[in-house]
Amino acid sequence: MLLSLVKFGILSVFLLAQEAVAIQLWNNTDGFSDDVPAAGRSALTFDVKCANYLVTARDVANGAALVGNLESHYCTEECHDSIDNFQRSSHLAYGTKAYALFKNSTARVVPGDIVNGLMWAYELSCIKDSTGYCLAGIYNHTKTACSECTLKYGAVMASSGYGRKQFPPNVFSSLLSSCNVPASSYTYVYTSSNPTTTPESSGVPSSATATPTSTCTGKTYIAKEDDTCKSISEAQSISTDRLVEVNHLDYSCSSLTSGTALCIEKNCTVYTVQAN
């Protein structure tokens, strides 16, 4: 499957009916440094009206997917519009200027990037096809590489700096080509954001955990129709064991399909043991 690059964990908490509540990333501005303009601080304590949690860019990058009725409670027009308003007010207050946002920290961040991450995480979490929400199915390998869900996922990943490291635009283009789907069917607008600015905690139900994502440090290869683990290993100079381990394939390689995005790293000289 396409996401054999990464091992994901699925949020599997089921909540009873919830009303949208106001959530703030920061309850007050006491922790902000003096570098942050007083006039714009209120923008960062914006009341976001979603369920009783926010899904951050870090959550989805670490493999979090909403399941059960969490999806329908979070993926609402009210939540989307509230995050959108938060995004607009933050951009209006701070633009693209970076600040030393927190006391006792010299790291300079663009406040708007944090909110961009919330909108990107919303769009990723709320991808749907005719059968329902997609993200959990993509993560647990029940959606095929050329499915509507996976192609929508690719477009959202390529649309932001938060997703491009795991799913670069050239990989998405190769996937569309291998699926014989025109790029015009899955267009996206790129929003440049610095992934280091995403909040570490979002308030997503704490009893659900996500498996940390392992990032590919090499290159990405798109499997072709006649590829096997052996042929890829030889052509890309990676041991078969390493190929299987990094991409979470089964050792018989039966899960390898055309269009699968594979991480190729720690190259070596491959030698196939001959008889005698």
From Swiss-Prot:
Residues 1-22 form the signal peptide. Its main location: secreted. It is found in: Secreted. Disruption phenotype: Leads to enhanced fungal virulence, with faster decaying on infected fruits. Glycans are attached at residues 27, 104, 140, 267. The keyword Transport does not apply. The keyword Signal applies. One of its GO terms (molecular function) is chitin binding. Gene3D superfamilies: LysM domain (3.10.350.10). Keywords: Chitin-binding, Glycoprotein, Secreted, Signal, Virulence. One of its GO terms (cellular component) is extracellular region. Residues 219-264 form the LysM domain. The LysM (lysin motif) domains are small globular domains involved in binding chitin in eukaryotes. LysM10 contains one LysM domain. In plants, chitin acts as a microbe-associated molecular pattern (MAMP) that is recognized by lysin motif (LysM)-containing plant cell surface-localized pattern recognition receptors (PRRs) that activate a plethora of downstream immune responses. Secreted LysM effector that might have a role in sequestration of chitin oligosaccharides (breakdown products of fungal cell walls that are released during invasion and act as triggers of host immunity) to dampen host defense. Belongs to the secreted LysM effector family. This is Secreted LysM effector LysM10. It comes from Penicillium expansum (Blue mold rot fungus). The gene is LysM10.
